[in-house]
């Protein structure tokens, strides 16, 4: 019988320790760091290995300022060193759950790619935070993706204005206890 491999401490530590950073230093991302973040997203698993995503990287300050208008809580995009828009085939048009573009599969896969990028950034000393897109027409106009594509989330990245933000303790309340959220075999 095969014994499960223990989770390496650095992986679990990163999962448990990553924090949202909304206040960024006025400093561009090192191109190698940006490439590693993008590679982390590229290496995410996906349903049927379709990799149904395109990443649009924005580094221009003017563009980032305009992107900050795509949602009521997207203001952090204006101060980011870079943003990565996560673009997929429009999941609202993918209604057949047996098809290659099943809406839940597309969004699940996108979440996997996003989390890989967030964890890679954290490991590099780079903060991040997601922005939900509410103004879809504005996002399409600014980013230029075709009508059959959709952007629901944009990730902000930057070196934190306060490096302690990457390692600060969780806010009071933290995570729910495992016993509150896990059921075995049945509810």
Q: Predicted segment positions?
A:
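Residue-level "edge-of-site" marker
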Residues: 54, 134, 153
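Short, flexible turn/loop "capping" segments at secondary-structure junctions
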Residues: 14-18, 46-49
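A short N-terminal beta-strand-loop micro-motif at the entrance of redox/enzyme domains
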Residues: 20-36
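Short secondary-structure boundary segments
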Residues: 88, 133, 159
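Small-aliphatic-rich amphipathic alpha-helix that forms the alpha element of a beta-alpha
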Residues: 41, 84, 99-142
């Amino acid at each position: 019988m095969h014994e499960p491999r223990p989770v390496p401490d650095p992986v679990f530590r990163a999962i448990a320790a990553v924090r949202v950073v909304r206040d960024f230093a006025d400093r561009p991302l090192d191109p190698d760091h940006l490439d590693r973040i993008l590679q982390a997203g590229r290496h995410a698993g996906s349903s049927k290995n379709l990799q149904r995503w395109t990443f649009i990287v924005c580094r221009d300050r003017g563009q980032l300022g305009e992107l900050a208008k795509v949602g009521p809580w997207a203001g952090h995009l204006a101060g980011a060193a870079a943003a990565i828009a996560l673009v997929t085939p429009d999941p609202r048009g993918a209604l057949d759950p047996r098809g290659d573009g099943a809406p839940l599969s597309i969004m699940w896969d996108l979440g996997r790619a996003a989390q890989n990028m967030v964890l890679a950034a954290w490991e590099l000393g780079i903060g991040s935070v997601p922005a939900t897109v509410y103004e879809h027409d504005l996002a399409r106009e600014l980013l230029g993706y075709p009508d059959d594509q959709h952007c629901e989330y944009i990730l902000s990245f930057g070196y934190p204005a306060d490096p302690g933000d990457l390692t600060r303790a969780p806010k009071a309340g933290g995570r729910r206890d495992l016993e509150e959220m896990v059921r075995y075999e049945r509810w």
